[in-house]
């Protein structure tokens, strides 16, 4: 039976007898992903006109797996930060951007909360 991937954090679930000689590195990566999800922090510089898409890669560290995301950069238009819609996760998002424009945190197929142009606060998403 081959390895599978967990639904929420995209951890590698190793099948019995798989990954001879490499299971330790896979386990270490899984532990680092758990650390990211529980207490991880990343500052994400937004593109001035389009925002950013948070990555959420199977079996790997990814900025979208962090608990706390600080949005930075100077924005020159209303922008979106796209989070994955295939997972259920709570984020703490700090809007530390400059520029008199909005930032909406949403999934690619949905809607989400918007930071107003003057709203430089923290939101739970």
Task: Annotate the PLM regions.
Residues 2-102:
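Exposed extracellular interaction/assembly regions and N-terminal maturation sites
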Residues 24-26, 118-125:
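Extracellular disulfide-bonded cysteine-rich modules/repeats
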Residues 110-116:
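Short, aromatic/His-centered strand-loop micro-motif at the edge of beta-sheets
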């Amino acid at each position: 039976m081959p390895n599978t991937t967990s639904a929420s954090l995209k951890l590698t679930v190793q099948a019995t007898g798989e990954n001879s000689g490499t299971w330790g590195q896979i386990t270490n990566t899984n532990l680092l992903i758990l650390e990211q999800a529980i207490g991880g922090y990343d500052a994400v510089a937004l593109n001035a006109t389009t925002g950013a898409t948070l990555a959420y890669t199977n079996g790997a560290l990814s900025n979208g797996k962090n608990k706390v995301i600080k949005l930075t950069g100077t924005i020159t238009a209303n922008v979106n930060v796209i989070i994955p819609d295939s997972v259920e996760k709570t984020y703490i998002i700090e809007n530390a951007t400059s520029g008199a424009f909005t930032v909406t945190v949403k999934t690619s197929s949905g809607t989400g909360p918007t930071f107003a142009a003057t709203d430089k606060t923290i939101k739970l998403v």
